[in-house]
């Protein structure tokens, strides 16, 4: 992904992308329960719905494939100021703390591979997810939940901003 100009964004309902991703995921992982939480008010988000849906599916697949004990995944959408916040959390084993700083790098060192216990492919998929989110003007992060399991979160701007708009809003 070379930049946001390659992404065709249309205003889409956030809860619809969550539902579509969950439905496609559950075709392949019917034993994993997926819970969806979204605001009551319709949240329209400028996005390439196919790419964002793929990010959500990839995050859910990683939760099952690498969480080992994952039986439930929660998809949550909230609004924080001018951002849509997407969260994918699970009840699996979580992410090894040594991997967290490098999770989106796209590669793992031999030591990190040993820690990750056969998670070599995870980094490549997550680096692509991060590139897609960044091309939309968003950010991505990962952490472990205090109650167990992993939490992967990404944000997308709620309004389309051009480079010209950004220059106008920057004080001289």
Model-derived regions: residue spans:
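Short alpha-helical Gxxx[C/S/T] motif in the catalytic ATP-binding
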Residues: 125, 129
């Amino acid at each position: 992904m070379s930049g946001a100009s390659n992404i065709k964004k249309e205003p889409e309902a956030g809860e619809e992308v969550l539902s579509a991703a969950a439905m496609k995921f559950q075709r392949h992982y019917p034993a994993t329960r997926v819970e969806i939480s979204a605001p009551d008010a319709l949240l329209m988000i400028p996005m390439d719905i196919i790419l964002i849906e793929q990010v959500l599916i990839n995050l859910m697949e990683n939760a099952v494939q690498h969480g080992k004990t994952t039986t439930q995944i929660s998809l949550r959408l909230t609004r924080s100021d001018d951002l849509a916040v997407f969260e994918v959390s699970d009840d699996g084993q979580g992410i090894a703390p040594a991997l967290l700083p490098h999770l989106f790098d796209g590669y793992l060192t031999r030591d990190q591979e040993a820690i990750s216990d056969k998670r070599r492919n995870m980094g490549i998929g997550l680096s692509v997810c991060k590139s897609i989110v960044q091309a939309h003007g968003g950010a991505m992060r990962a952490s472990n939940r205090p109650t167990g399991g992993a939490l992967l979160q990404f944000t997308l701007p709620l309004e389309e901003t051009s480079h010209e708009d950004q220059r106008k809003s920057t004080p001289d």
